[in-house]
Amino acid sequence: MRTYDISNETMPRYLLLTDLDGCLLDSETYSFDDARPALNALRAEHIPIILVSGKTRAEFDPLRERLDHRYPFIVENGAAVYVPLDTFSFSPERSRRRSSYHVIELGTPYALLRDVLRQIEEAVGTPLRGFGDLSIEEIMATTGLLREDALRAKLREFDEPFLVNGPPKLIEEICRQIVTRGLNWTRGGRFFHLTGNNDKGRAAEILLRCYRRQGQLQDPPEEIETIGIGDSLNDLPLLLTVDHPVLVQRPDGSYDPDINLPNLIRASGRGPAGWNQVVLDLLRHTTQEAAREQTVNIRVT
């Protein structure tokens, strides 16, 4: 995998932050083949892709190899930010070195989350099955992951996905129990998630501050615009953080009804195909804007 040396590249004008499952990756096959045209276009324009997911650190390794990904990434729904060492000319605040990364940890330890899930299960009188309770075979059946990928998904550090079967009132009570214990919850494509005081938006904002700081160190200083892509409620904090929020259709062709922002862009497609189309459309728009700005600058000079 290539390393990114900030001294050899100018700062990007745009950053794209994206959810994975159901967006860049197909929710059933986990393929990104339909998104390859947009991925190639982003690479040609030197636009960093920041991967933001509920996936574990262990799951990211093979995925980043497949994508030839060299930029920062955010794991377990904003629980930790991983920044390759050569990304910035400084060490991010509150980071520690871990292998070839600066790591900023924001999440609550997994063991504590498991204990709280058991407490809530007892309080509501209903079994709650977390990832830690599922066998590898059950994870494979629920998610469609291959065995090796399911094993990697089990290596959780900060976020406990769990399954709930019951009426809305039960779900409301479970969520209330979580909040009264000083923790948070969110909903992804398949699971609810028990987390600490972290989310995708908070992690993204910390990373964006680093990019903006680096941009101000350039001569002349560079401003950065941000694009964020998601498909479900756990992506809402991310979409609230960026300049251009994008919502991809769910597998059934609908949009998550809990996400409704005034400047929201709705992709006219689902999964990586919808992701591909909306990214290409945005790139065309930014190219046209850049051409207009260049024309104005020429006229002024």
Language-model segments: which ranges?
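Short, structured coil segments at secondary-structure junctions
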Residues: R66-H69, E76-N77, R181, T241-V242, ...
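A short, Lys/Arg-enriched amphipathic alpha-helix followed by its capping loop at the start of a domain
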Residues: T10, Y14-T18, D34-I47, C210, ...
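Mg2+-dependent phosphoryl-transfer enzymes with acidic/Ser/Thr/Gly-rich catalytic loops
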Residues: I6-M11, F32, F191-T301
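Active-site phosphate-binding/coordination module
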Residues: F32-G130
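Hydrophobic "anchor" residues on beta-strands that sit immediately upstream
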Residues: L15, P72, I227
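Conserved acidic, metal-coordinating active-site core of Asp-based
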Residues: I120-I227
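Short hydrophobic/aromatic-enriched beta-strand-loop microsegments
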Residues: R70-E76, E148-A150, P245-R250
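Asp-based phosphoryl-transfer active-site loop
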Residues: P12-T29, L239
